[in-house]
Each structure stands twice: as structure tokens, then as C-alpha cells.
Amino acid sequence: MKYQHIIDYLIQTAGPSIEDAGLSDERVNKRTEAGLCKSFRRYICGVEGDEDCDYFKVDEEGMLYVFNGQYYELMLEETLLELIIEVMEKKNVGIVYQTGSAKIVRDYCLNRLKGDERCKFVPNRQYICFKNGVFDLGTMKLNQFDLKYKTDIILDFDYVADAKSALWDKVLGMTVPDENMRETFHQYCGCFLASRTEYKIEYILFVVGEGQNGKSIICKAVVNMLGPNVASSYSPEQLFKSSQMEYHLADVNGKIVNYCDEVSNKDFSGGDFKQFVSGGAFTGRHPYSKRPTKVDKIPLMLCCANKIPPTTDDTEGYFRR
């Protein structure tokens, strides 16, 4: 089972206090039900100072995350319900509680997770999770997987310190012949992994050239390597000029790069553009949500274009970016 380690964790921790609870009951006893709620909450929500019980978190949007042994991943609330039922079954909890109380237990735990600041999932992008460990950008070392490394940058390949790619060097050299420009491209892509709360990065990168010159190939190679969880693909017009821009801004929040494969020949300059490139906050909105959401985790912009788009903004601030 995918979450067997979570089931094992709950059996080892909450298990002893719920074993055989209400085994012979023919109807739900509220006192027994309350005891189940308390036992599960202790180890799903944890307590102050007990870092070993930090398996479950909730983000600012109320989405549930669970530590899967390597990193924190999204979990459906229905999946948590299934895990609680399975733990109850394995610990011989009465059947009336498995069918009648498991959802109450689940909701009791979720309410605490969502209401307790200690349970908030706050990713630290000093850490990057690879398949073979967690890389610390502060120490530049690879560490073993651990609950303490809370990150949302998950890369589906191994970290190899001295890895080289002759094919990448060849294609990049053909596409960007100038060595200084290649170094600039490398540096900008490296900035995707930098925390914008620690470093002030106020640039957009245009890879400019005629069609079929390889610019999309090198950009897509980088973006596809990072994966859709941290990379979005909206055009500047969709982000700064569209009537749907609030939805698009909400969607890019938390990404590390927004890539546009083909920038149109339209002017998208202005205050919103400069604010975005500087990492300034916006107000966005998720589809079907009645409440606006703060957009303050702004990605860097990487764009391909046949030529630099026109602008009506002749300020120093625009050209500096």
C-alpha cells in the first residue's frame, strides 16, 4: 500500500491506546468515540516540541500534506479517512466505530491541523529533494531524507555532484554561441532555486532568435527537468493584460519559474509587469473561490521570442529588468 509507512506509524503510536476500543459495542458510545478522537489527534497533529510526530501538515489554502518517507506530498482528505479506518481495523476497534466514527475522527484532526499555526506547511526552499536525498543549498551538501526538511521542490532524479552532459553542452553551445551569454543563461536558471525572500532578483530573461534555432529546446529541457509542480507556462499577456489574470496569478503562486515558449509581438509593459518581475505581491483568485488570495511567491520569468517585444514604457526601471 502506498501509505503503509503512515499506517505503521499510527499503529505504533496511537495503536496501543485504541486497541480493542468498543470491540463489543453494538452502538457508538460517545465517550469511546471521544477517546478515539484524542488518540488519533495526538499523533496526526502532534504536540509542541515533539518533532517525531510531524508527519501531517496543512498549507495556507487548507490542503493536506503528508510526509511520504522522502518529502511532503498532497493527500486527499478521503485518503486520510481510509487510513484511519485501516488503523482501526488492524487494532481491532469495534466495527460500529469503523463505520460510524472514523469520519468524525478525521474531521476532528483536520480542524486542529487547519487551526494550529504549528501545523502549517511552510516550505523552505533552502532544501531540494532528489531521489537519493535532500540537498541543502546553505551547506551545499546532500542529506538523508528527514521530516525536518520541509520543501516543495521535488526533482525526480538523483543528485550527482560532478555530473556532466556532453549533449547539453553541445546543444547549448550551438544555440548560444557567446560564452558570456551561456554563463548568463546558466546563472539565471540557477536563480530558479534561490529563495526570493533571501535574494533580490529583479530580472526577466528573453532567449531571442529566429525560429528553429534551438532556443525552445534548451529552455524546455530546463523547465521539463524541474517538472509541472514548480513550473507554469503562462504568456505575459495572460498574466498582465488578460481579464482572467487573477486566476492565472493564483496558479503561478509558489512556482519557481514561469516559461513562455513564444512571446507575441504585443506590448505587455507597465506597472504589473515591473511589479511581477521584481517579485511584488498581487491579489489573485482561484476558480470557483469567492475569496481572493494573496499571491506573494512569484516565479522568475523565462521567455522565448523571435525578437524583443515592443514597449511603451521607456523608464529606466523597465529596461533594468
Residue ranges of each PLM-predicted region?
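Substrate-gripping "pore-loop 1 plus following alpha2 helix"
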Residues: 234-244, 271-292
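Intein modules and their embedded homing endonuclease domains
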Residues: 1-153
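Phosphate-sensing "switch" segment of ASCE/P-loop ATPases
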Residues: 295-298, 314-321
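P-loop NTPase catalytic core of nucleic-acid-dependent motor ATPases
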Residues: 52-78, 121, 134-254
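AAA+/SF3 P-loop NTPase mechanochemical coupling elements
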Residues: 247-253, 285-304
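Conserved AAA+/SF3 P-loop NTPase catalytic/coupling segment centered on the Walker-B
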Residues: 255-279, 311-318
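A short, contiguous, amphipathic alpha-helix enriched in charged residues
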Residues: 33-41, 223-226, 267-283
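Catalytic nucleotidyl-transfer cores of nucleotide-processing enzymes
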Residues: 124-132, 297-310
